[in-house]
């Protein structure tokens, strides 16, 4: 793999994006009790929110693969950040349970349908078929490093 500046910067930006965009829907892993208390949610209600996100995400993997092959990658990377950011802003306003269902469903769309599939397609194009294992291994390692650093910031 030719490790030019453009490839390395593209790789780092995508890995950073992959690490951070999934922090919001999976925030429950770190702040489960405080979120339940702040939003006045029961364990069952929070479980339903997680299920909504997971089910929407499952369907969106198929749709995302189709979209990433047919539309401009720049837009498919920009829109999820803007959409997830707007959903995070809405989430920070202590919404009602019905609104939370909408937020988590929309996060399944913004994080998986438009971002994940496009990021994976671009990462795949950064190296030959013999380098895919190394690229995806470094991607997973980088996601862990960036997510860990973001936790402390």
What residues fall within each predicted segment?
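Pair of pore-lining "gating" transmembrane helices in MFS-fold secondary transporters
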Residues: 3-31
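Membrane-interface helix caps of multi-pass secondary transporters
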Residues: 27-40, 123
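Central cavity-lining transmembrane alpha-helices of secondary-active solute carriers
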Residues: 48-66
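Primarily marks hydrophobic transmembrane alpha-helices of the MFS/SLC 12-helix fold
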Residues: 74-77
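C-terminal ends and interior cores of transmembrane alpha-helices
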Residues: 82-96
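Hydrophobic core of transmembrane alpha-helices in multi-pass small-molecule transporters
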Residues: 87, 99-114
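Intracellular juxtamembrane helix-capping segments at the cytosolic ends
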Residues: 113-128
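Glycine-rich segments within core transmembrane alpha-helices of 12-TM secondary carriers
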Residues: 133-153
């Amino acid at each position: 793999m030719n490790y030019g500046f453009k490839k390395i910067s593209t790789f780092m930006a995508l890995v950073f994006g992959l690490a951070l965009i999934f922090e919001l829907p999976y925030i429950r892993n770190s702040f489960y009790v405080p979120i339940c208390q702040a939003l006045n949610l029961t364990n069952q209600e929070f479980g339903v929110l997680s299920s909504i996100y997971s089910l929407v995400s499952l369907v969106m993997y198929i749709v995302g693969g189709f979209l990433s092959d047919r539309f401009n990658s720049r837009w498919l990377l920009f829109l999820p950040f803007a959409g997830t950011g707007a959903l995070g802003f809405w989430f920070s306003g202590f919404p009602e349970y019905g609104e939370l269902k909408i937020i988590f469903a929309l996060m399944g769309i913004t994080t998986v349908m438009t971002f994940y599939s496009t990021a994976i397609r671009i990462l795949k194009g950064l190296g030959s078929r013999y380098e895919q294992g190394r690229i995806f291994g470094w991607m997973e390692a980088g996601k862990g490093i960036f997510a860990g650093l973001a936790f402390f910031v």
